[in-house]
Amino acid sequence: MANYFNTLNLREQLDQLGRCRFMAREEFATEADYLKGKKVVIVGCGAQGLNQGLNMRDSGLDVSYALRQAAIDEQRQSFKNAKNNGFNVGSYEQLIPTADLVINLTPDKQHTSVVNAVMPLMKQGAALGYSHGFNIVEEGMQIRKDITVVMVAPKCPGTEVREEYKRGFGVPTLIAVHPENDPQGEGWEIAKAWAAATGGHRAGCLASSFVAEVKSDLMGEQTILCGMLQAGSIVCYEKMVADGIDPGYAGKLLQFGWETITEALKFGGITHMMDRLSNPAKIKAFELSEELKDLMRPLYNKHMDDIISGHFSSTMMADWANDDKDLFGWRAETAETAFENYPTTDVKIAEQEYFDNGILMIAMVRAGVELAFEAMTASGIIDESAYYESLHELPLIANTVARKRLYEMNVVISDTAEYGNYLFANVAVPLLREKFMPKVGTDVIGKGLGVVSNQVDNATLIEVNSIIRNHPVEYIGEELRGYMKDMKRIAVGD
């Protein structure tokens, strides 16, 4: 199979990368009705599989799980996930032939074998669904021409898909129809109904393409969403402990600080996050973030270039063929980091203290969001896609760190995201250790500025505020957040 994106000419590539339209709520007036009375069979019952299925069932759909016979016989975790939640479970041969919509929610590296196994069993005119287009775009999977191929891609880990649904909301979702596979012209109706059944329409859906979803998703998860949180946690913890900060306090400031800081980001963008700081702290965070952007821009651009060219995909697939040797090795190394093993503490940290004592963390968030957004848009991905894959999804990933540190983040994201995260962090950590962290102290990470006066130069503050507020990610963010008035606030801090 050939990389689908690389078979397109430049005009077609740019057209597919630029597909992204925010859909009006009126387009979801019938919600999930198009799929009611039809049989939905999900293949795979991991984080995305289980949680999407729970939402879809609660939305009135007929949902079953098809698993490999070995998973059923051995009662593996996927079988337990489905059975313990009251779902009908069967083998491919039992469930696939009667399914109207087969949704493949297995890990990326299993997609080719899974699709090759289920496609001969699918009835004429059925639909095949994905939540990530890697198999279509990067592996070039060819689907039988009578089958409609759609995508519904929630912009967060599977656990958060469920949590946001239970809060009465949802998560922003990209939907798409593969242009090579829409024989009956019903792809968009299927995708809209599926998205509504997960609750995505409440947060906002983007009519996109498989190509735009894959390229933007890979970039976001590798850099700001996961890679920067991992690198930042590791180097900031090391710095604080080396400079005499109590290890328990240092670890807690980071583990729960990312969530607290990015919760402000979710509701008011970088502007609001920076406004939570005093004026002197805001200027300091701005200066640090500008330095970080200069230092890390080449790394962000390299990741974007490798994603667009297909180099990242081929590298990761080579590791698949090597039994994930690199992935498992990097996972084990992460488990041994000092941050992952910090001693728990009962110390209370107030919400504002996370901002006051986490100035460097705020600088890292601003720098990372803007760098990822800039790299994506410079490559032809439009602002809406770049916003969701850089800024909006960040609080959802930070929530996972708050639960069980980096372990939880890497468990709930896909193996593809985890692999890309390590590629980024493995370069970012030594880069920051050598070029940046020796120049900072506990005034920006651990203790705060400790200044008595908030007096600053007016001209400097005006210039800083103007630069922050006039970045393109802030313009598109304000527009898109206007569609998400129902976002639920989560409890942060102690």
Curated annotation (Swiss-Prot):
Pathway where it operates: Amino-acid biosynthesis; L-isoleucine biosynthesis; L-isoleucine from 2-oxobutanoate: step 2/4; Amino-acid biosynthesis; L-valine biosynthesis; L-valine from pyruvate: step 2/4
EC number: 1.1.1.86
Cofactor: Mg(2+)
Binding-site list for Mg(2+) 1: D217, E221
KARI N-terminal Rossmann domain span: 14-208
Chain residues that bind substrate: S414
Pfam families per record: KARI_C, KARI_N
Primary enzyme class: oxidoreductase
Catalytic reaction annotation: (2R)-2,3-dihydroxy-3-methylbutanoate + NADP(+) = (2S)-2-acetolactate + NADPH + H(+); (2R,3R)-2,3-dihydroxy-3-methylpentanoate + NADP(+) = (S)-2-ethyl-2-hydroxy-3-oxobutanoate + NADPH + H(+)
Active site residues of this protein: H132
KARI C-terminal knotted domain: residues covered: 209-344, 345-487
Keywords from the UniProt entry: Amino-acid biosynthesis, Branched-chain amino acid biosynthesis, Magnesium, Metal-binding, NADP, Oxidoreductase, Repeat
A GO MF label: ketol-acid reductoisomerase activity
InterPro entries xrefs: 6-PGluconate_DH-like_C_sf, 6PGD_dom2, KARI, KARI_C, KARI_N, NAD(P)-bd_dom_sf
Binding residues for NADP(+): C45, G46, A47, Q48, R68, R76, S78, D108, K109, Q110, G158
Binding of Mg(2+) 2, residues: D217, E389, E393
Keyword NADP in annotation: yes
Family, as annotated: Belongs to the ketol-acid reductoisomerase family.
HAMAP family xrefs: IlvC (MF_00435)
Name used for this protein in its record: Ketol-acid reductoisomerase (NADP(+))
Gene, per the UniProt record: ilvC
